[in-house]
């Protein structure tokens, strides 16, 4: 009900700013632990970077050779999502191909690095790779199958929000953080604008989480903190 009267202040354990994949996930995690959480989003859920991505659920294979730590983190989270949010994941798998000009020397190194990071990496015949993906380059001389997948970011974020609310979290969309509340050099809450009614309200918490994604530096600036971020756009050709 947008006509409700807001109290002057309302107390929570944690306030999360940003209703994308990260913010929704934090809200759910907190609520499952019995932490009273408030999620604030200036637009609608998943309208930022979360709603503008390729939806690839990385296995971590692409990082295995050069960044094992990231590869291990990817496969761990990959498996968690498949287990707890299978309705949001399409288990497509992924193919890493070797062309004649590449040779097969790197393939062995790649497979070894994947397996060392805990990532399934199956060397398959090029004919099998073409059966799995008919549009692949038929000139390939090698192929490795890894557990990449596709994730629906809208469904996943919405599912996290729904579950967070079911466990006691409060979620306010179209609520923009105007400023932070401070006491003795500590952030103690936020001042918020309801962008639909024009009303303002204050919410307090022991912890405030900045989950604003690429806009996080603007949020941090309101708290007097400089976070150096360089926004970058990319394109995908299919």
Where are these regions (language model features)?
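Core beta-strand elements of the Rossmann-like FAD/NAD(P) dinucleotide-binding domain
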Residues: 10-12, 197-207
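N-terminal Rossmann-like FAD-binding beta1-loop-alpha1 element of flavoenzymes
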Residues: 13-38
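Short hydrophobic core segments
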Residues: 17, 203-213
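Glycine-rich FAD pyrophosphate-binding loop
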Residues: 31-51
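Dinucleotide-binding Rossmann-like beta1-alpha1 core, especially the glycine-rich loop
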Residues: 55-128, 132
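Central beta-strand plus flanking loop segment that forms part of the substrate or channel wall
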Residues: 57, 224-238
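Flavin (FAD/FMN) cofactor-binding and adjacent substrate-gating region
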Residues: 97-167, 172-173, 179-186, 191, ...
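Flavin (primarily FAD) binding-site architecture
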Residues: 210-224
């Amino acid at each position: 009900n947008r006509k409700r009267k807001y109290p002057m202040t309302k107390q929570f354990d944690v306030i999360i700013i940003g209703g994308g994949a990260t913010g929704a996930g934090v809200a759910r995690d907190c609520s499952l632990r019995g932490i009273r959480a408030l999620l604030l989003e200036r637009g609608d859920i998943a309208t930022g970077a979360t709603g503008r991505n390729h939806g690839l659920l990385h296995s971590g294979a692409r990082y295995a050779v050069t960044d094992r730590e990231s590869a291990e983190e990817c496969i761990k989270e990959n498996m968690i999502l498949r287990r707890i949010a299978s309705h949001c994941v399409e288990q497509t798998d992924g193919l890493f191909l070797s062309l004649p000009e590449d040779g097969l020397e790197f393939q062995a190194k790649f497979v070894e690095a994947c397996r060392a990071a805990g990532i399934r990496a199956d060397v398959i015949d090029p004919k099998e790779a073409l059966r799995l993906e008919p549009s692949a380059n038929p000139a390939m001389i090698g192929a490795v199958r890894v557990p990449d997948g596709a994730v629906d970011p809208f469904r996943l974020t919405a599912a996290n929000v729904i579950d967070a609310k079911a466990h006691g979290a409060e979620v306010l969309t179209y609520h923009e953080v105007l400023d932070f509340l401070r006491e003795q050099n500590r952030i103690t809450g936020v001042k918020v604008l309801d962008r639909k009614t024009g009303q303002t309200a204050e919410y307090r918490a022991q912890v405030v989480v900045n989950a604003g994604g690429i806009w996080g530096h603007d949020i941090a600036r309101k708290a007097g903190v400089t976070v150096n971020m360089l926004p970058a756009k990319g394109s995908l050709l299919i």
